[in-house]
Amino acid sequence: MEADGQKYSVLAKTQVREKMMKEIEQISEVFLVSKSDATVILIRLGWNSFKASDLLGDNKEKFLAKLGLARVLNSNSSSADRETGDGDYLVSTPFCSHKFSTTCWSEYLSDALKKNKEQRGLISCLSQDCVASVGPDTIEQLTEPVKEMYENYILESFMECHKATIKWCPASGCEYAVELQEDGNEDNVISVVCLCGHTFCWTCGLESHRPVSCKKASIWWTYLLDQSRSISWIHTNTKSCPKCKIPVQQNGDPNYRLINCICSNNFCWICLRTEEQHQGNWNCSPVAVPAAGPSTVEFSQILHLNLWEAGHEALKKAKSKLRALEEKIIPKLIENCGATELDIRTVREAGMLSVQCRQVLKWSCVFDYSIIEYESTKKQYLKHLRALASTMLCMHEGKLDELIHLALSPEDFTNYKHKLEISTTCTGNHFDGFIKELEDGKPEVKADGYENEPGSRWFCDRCTFENSWVDKQCKMCFFPLDYHPSPQVAAAPEDLGKSE
């Protein structure tokens, strides 16, 4: 994990704005242009400060004129302060004399900002043929809703152009951003934890899914998860008709026991006998033998769905604990124990590590699902690794609880903090090894069955998942094997090209 060598930092929205303003101020100060003009320049150039410096250094006046940041008409006497009625005023850009009411500007800019949301192009004067650019200095004269919309437009432009190194947390309602550190490598940062408790994959934006690949995580998230829930619901809430074996759901009245199947067979929901077999006596007991159980594939889906949901509940508790740590515990530690910023970082990283580890354990059941059933040795070994990782995590969470509940003085805090630092490092290293072992495919574990037999695998045409030839459909996306040639009839390389 990244707890003891974190390659990213979590920023509040105000901190992101500060970074943005720093770039604007640098261009403004070095090339003696207003902050408003510097903002327009950076938006137009995709926030490429180096390119902006080159163009401003080569021919500043020509470049500014090209962007509509130079006067295009001799302005008449200012009437920006002249009232037009109902509190409305006439406003123009600093580069032209075309004046329009604030109402017209507001309507125009609302539409223009929405259209420019993707293109990040220039916004020109409201006059049809005028090339004067609209910047923050013009926006400042307008209403508060327009100002807020324009500020968000600038910020989103900044984020979009820096998305390789900084991204918003995708959690609903969260306003934190995650930024890679200067020595961080985007390819090496896979899982990040926001201060809101949400963990997500830097590459694909889904919730963090290590040790599962982005592709398999997407398939599980968008298709298999819903299918598994449907299968689980069917086997919990239906019974198979004794005649046609089709799953049948009880009607809305739990007291009405006679079920009508689409095959025209009527049977009792309790004992599965027909109405005639009851002979008017409905005082029956449930049958000892249930209806047809799930298939091997369905059973596997139900099993892993239960593991997934148990892991999800444990993750929710870890996230809730992290929020409480941030909102309640840390302020108390500062007040009662005199905790410094470095101390708080230690406690915060311990809580974030707990969330990361719970996320890994949750997704490890999906990794287990992707292992074909004949690789039983790998499944057993994975079960062993998961048990070790769970034990290690419980011990780490115990150390964090000790600090939270028992550190009542600066001396206590120092003692428990030292233990927590050791636990964070050891637990992070253990889960790093756990993840790496799974992502590398556990090469030291020899799979049972057909592992070394020629032609014992086929790759799904839809999702490229590797299946065994005994599987008649893909275990990941259920694409049928119909179009794949059997290994028994496939021609050997030395036979290719031979005539009859």
UniProtKB/Swiss-Prot annotation:
Cysteine pairs bridged by disulfides in the record: none
Lineage: Eukaryota, Viridiplantae, Streptophyta, Embryophyta, Tracheophyta
Tissue specificity of this protein: Preferentially expressed in green siliques.
Zinc finger (IBR-type) stretch: 148-214
Keywords: Metal-binding, Repeat, Transferase, Ubl conjugation pathway, Zinc, Zinc-finger
Name assigned to this protein: Probable E3 ubiquitin-protein ligase ARI16
Top EC class, one word: transferase
GO molecular function: ubiquitin-protein transferase activity; zinc ion binding
ZnF bounds (RanBP2-type): 453-483
Pathway this chain belongs to: Protein modification; protein ubiquitination
Binding site for Zn(2+) 2: 169, 174, 194, 196
Gene Ontology biological-process annotations: protein ubiquitination
Reaction catalysis annotation: [E2 ubiquitin-conjugating enzyme]-S-ubiquitinyl-L-cysteine + [acceptor protein]-L-lysine = [E2 ubiquitin-conjugating enzyme]-L-cysteine + [acceptor protein]-N(6)-ubiquitinyl-L-lysine
Cofactor, how bound (note): Binds 4 Zn(2+) ions per subunit.
Record remark: domains: Members of the RBR family are atypical E3 ligases. They interact with the E2 conjugating enzyme UBE2L3 and function like HECT-type E3 enzymes: they bind E2s via the first RING-type zinc finger, but require an obligate trans-thiolation step during the ubiquitin transfer, requiring a conserved active site Cys residue in the second RING-type zinc finger. The active site probably forms a thioester intermediate with ubiquitin taken from the active-site cysteine of the E2 before ultimately transferring it to a Lys residue on the substrate.
Needed co-factor(s): Zn(2+)
ZnF locations on chain (RING-type): 78-130, 241-271
SMART domains referenced in this protein's UniProt entry, alphabetically: IBR
Binding site for Zn(2+) 3: 201, 204, 209, 214
Function: Might act as an E3 ubiquitin-protein ligase, or as part of E3 complex, which accepts ubiquitin from specific E2 ubiquitin-conjugating enzymes and then transfers it to substrates.
InterPro entries listed in its UniProt record: E3_UB_ligase_RBR, IBR_dom, TRIAD_supradom, Znf_RanBP2, Znf_RING/FYVE/PHD
